[in-house]
């Protein structure tokens, strides 16, 4: 999240006249993230104060956005803890604001857990599997817009900024993934709507009366798309279950997340055989996007681009850990 488009409280108050949400009490920009303009919104209605998140979309279009917003509504209706879009009086959940698409969603309770333990990871794995199953009958379809075709397109733009070793790594890995994506094994993998960006800062935990952290929900679905479920798991493991300094997988956390996921949606032998390929794909996707954001940034208030070397390091670690015969490697959580 970030703020590319600034708005005043008065502007928001006028825009909100089309909603039954009451009066604006506070509007506060959210600094984290790099894609859209986001604000915490406090409203007072009939003596009650409620919290929302306002998002102004900087890249996604009115045509693309219904996929994401209706997916969130679909999941929320099925008991998955995600932000629910708030409709205006006319029933629409997407409206123009300062010439760009904008929406309001409920604000989930809790705070991000940036130093997760095995229990946090288990809760994430359980809910991720339930989310995949709940989304299986979602009727809209849109591919993951940051998948292989985008990596190949973006490669040409970022190569001039890389040294020889980085260029060789990027080109080799994109070629490897292109071959994997073209394989019969890849085509056979289970798929459906995926979050595709489920990092530590895109989930919230609440502390209960006993002091235990409970998962409050997932948010920021604006990179979601139809993809292989295993890719979504790999992206999640590559963030939640690593040593941030080295990129190494933490076995205890990884096993906790994967066992919890596997208990809800058992993974297949084909998924086991290509787990390493997907870990590499997940690392590559974010190395490419962070290189692009770092070297070809957009102007924005509060923009904080991420260090691309983090995912370069993770990709190299996954390559170093590649078993001699990946197809015979057992599932890492069994």
UniProtKB/Swiss-Prot annotation:
EC number: 2.7.1.39
Entry protein name: Homoserine kinase
Family assignment from sequence similarity: Belongs to the pseudomonas-type ThrB family.
Entry-linked InterPro entries: Aminoglycoside_PTrfase, Homoserine_kinase_II, Kinase-like_dom_sf, Pseudomonas-type_ThrB
EC category: transferase
GO terms for MF: ATP binding; homoserine kinase activity
Disulphides: none
GO BP term (any one): threonine biosynthetic process
Alphabetically ordered keywords of this record: Amino-acid biosynthesis, ATP-binding, Kinase, Nucleotide-binding, Threonine biosynthesis, Transferase
Catalyzed chemical reaction(s): L-homoserine + ATP = O-phospho-L-homoserine + ADP + H(+)
CDD domains: HomoserineK_II (cd05153)
Pathway the protein acts in: Amino-acid biosynthesis; L-threonine biosynthesis; L-threonine from L-aspartate: step 4/5
């Amino acid at each position: 999240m970030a703020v590319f488009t600034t708005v005043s409280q008065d502007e928001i108050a006028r825009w909100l006249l089309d909603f039954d949400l009451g009066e604006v009490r506070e509007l506060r920009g959210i600094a984290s993230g790099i894609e859209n303009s986001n604000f915490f919104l406090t409203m007072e209605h009939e003596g009650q104060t409620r919290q929302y998140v306002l998002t102004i979309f900087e890249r996604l279009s009115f045509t693309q956005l219904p996929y994401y917003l209706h997916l969130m509504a679909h999941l929320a209706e099925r008991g998955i803890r995600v932000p629910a879009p708030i409709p205006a009086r006319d029933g629409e959940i997407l409206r123009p604001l300062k010439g760009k698409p904008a929406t309001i969603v409920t604000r989930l309770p809790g705070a991000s857990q940036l130093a997760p333990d095995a229990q946090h990871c288990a809760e994430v794995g359980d809910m991720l599997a339930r989310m995949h199953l709940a989304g299986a009958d979602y009727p809209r379809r849109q591919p993951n817009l940051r998948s292989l075709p985008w990596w190949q397109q973006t490669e040409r733009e970022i190569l001039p900024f890389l040294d020889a070793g980085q260029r060789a790594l990027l080109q080799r890995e994109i070629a490897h993934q292109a071959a994997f994506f073209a394989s019969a094994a890849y085509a056979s993998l289970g798929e459906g709507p995926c979050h595709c960006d489920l990092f530590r800062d895109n989930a919230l935990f609440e502390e209960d009366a006993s002091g235990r952290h409970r998962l409050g929900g997932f948010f920021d679905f604006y990179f979601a798309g139809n993809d292989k479920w295993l890719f979504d798991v790999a992206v999640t493991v590559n963030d939640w279950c690593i040593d941030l300094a080295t990129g190494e997988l933490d076995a205890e956390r990884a096993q906790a997340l994967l066992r919890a996921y596997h208990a809800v949606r058992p993974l297949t032998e084909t998924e086991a055989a290509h787990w390493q390929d997907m870990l590499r794909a997940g690392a590559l996707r974010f190395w490419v996007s962070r290189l692009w954001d770092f070297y070809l940034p957009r102007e924005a208030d509060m923009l904080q681009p991420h260090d691309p070397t983090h995912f370069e390091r993770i990709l190299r670690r996954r390559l170093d850990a590649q078993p001699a015969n990946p197809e015979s490697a057992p599932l890492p959580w069994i």
